[in-house]
Amino acid sequence: MIDFTSLLACPRCDKPLADLSCIACRVDFPVRDGVPWLFAEPDAAMTEWHNRWQLALANLNQDKKRVRAAIGKNSDPQTLVRLELLQRGYVEQKKCLTRLLEPLGLQAQADLETHLALKTRPPTQQGLFTYVANLHRDWCWGEEENQFGFGAIKAALQGIEPDKILVLGAGAARLAYDLHQSLESAITVALDFNPLLVYAATNIINGNPVTLWEFPLAPKRSEDVAIQRILSAPDPVREGFHYVLGDALRAPFKPGQFDAVITPWFIDVVEEAPAKMIPRINRLLGHGGVWINYGSLAFDQTNPANRLSLPEFISLSTHCGFTDIEAVEATVPYMNCPDSRHGRLEDVVTIRAVKQTDASQPERHQALPDWIVNGKRPVPLTQSFQSQATITRIHAYIMSLIDGKRTLEDMAGMLEQQKLMQKAAATSAIRGFLITMFEEQGSGRGY
């Protein structure tokens, strides 16, 4: 059996690790409940996720209070049954999550300065619960979708059985689990940065079912507003499967260690431009190794030039050291919870590429610019900052006008007096702003 630790490298300096420690950086990478935290700054990452967990708890408590208040104002028997079930779901979900995320209560002392200096942090748009529905799909009701994804990946392997597989952005890990169970590879490494997905899946694949509540987006029946799910794997995962908490943009592995790298629903949602991310994937593969990308290939990038079409993606991959590139397209069900009226079909593409040559590597990923990190360079007056400054001033002024007495028309007149906007435009703008504020105060969240 291949020694898992022999594959690892420091995400700070890329030097090999010794017993999950980097001698050069003088950093020990902790293991919490059997999962190594291989972020560039593990203590800061743990603190960051702990803080996000506390924020999520506060939001959950707020929603619970909102439901309790609604119960007190309603007398319809059917409505009360639905609201009481929703309230129970929130209460029980908090208990389930607290048990599951116990490792986040063991975080070390925060080291913000080191965190900043390394310019690493989890993406701000990714919360603990961003992909919680994937747990229910992977380990409860999504067998059709799971099997299609697994079948597409297995077909793309074209009969080879890699000794070392890496799944980047493994999420709730059903695909990584299915590959490991069926291909009899010596070792499978699943990397993700979300501790909720990682700790839930770690329990599940090791034969310890996890209880969580699902709150379908569009419940079909009143009793579907909050559903207790038992998430379990068909069988305990066989030896050789390793879960890692880390950042794929600073993947903690030595170069050329893997025979296959799988990127499911990953390459088009990661924050880095594909011209940088594809070479990083190349680096992880040995010569002749296979890269398989699976997903919708719908790039979400600020720069329009990075929202690649399939032909552009294939061309770029060729320039990044890959050859024999094949693409297969299909329409598949996506997140079709049987208890929700919400679901869709997704056009996915499975891309197979073989590493032919090494690719020139971009600079180490930095999430933060120097003018934020060291504080000694001028903050650039970008167009975005100028626009945001104006918007913020107007929003702050509007909020200052809310005193419980002024009408929307009164406020629009005052904006005109301040020569910020014409009254007709101000009326429309304030109405839109207040609509957003009103809707956000009652918005629900996924748990």
Say what each PLM segment does.
Residues 205-250:
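S-adenosyl-L-methionine
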Residues 246-261:
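A short acidic, Gly/Pro-enriched loop at the edge of an enzyme's catalytic core
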Residues 275-288:
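A short glycine-rich, Lys/Arg-flanked "PGG" loop and its adjoining helix->strand segment in the class I
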Residues 288-297:
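Conserved beta-strand signature within the Rossmann-like core of class I S-adenosyl-L-methionine
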Residues 320, 334-376:
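Core SAM-dependent methyltransferase catalytic element
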Residues 384-447:
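Long, charge-rich, low-complexity alpha-helical segments
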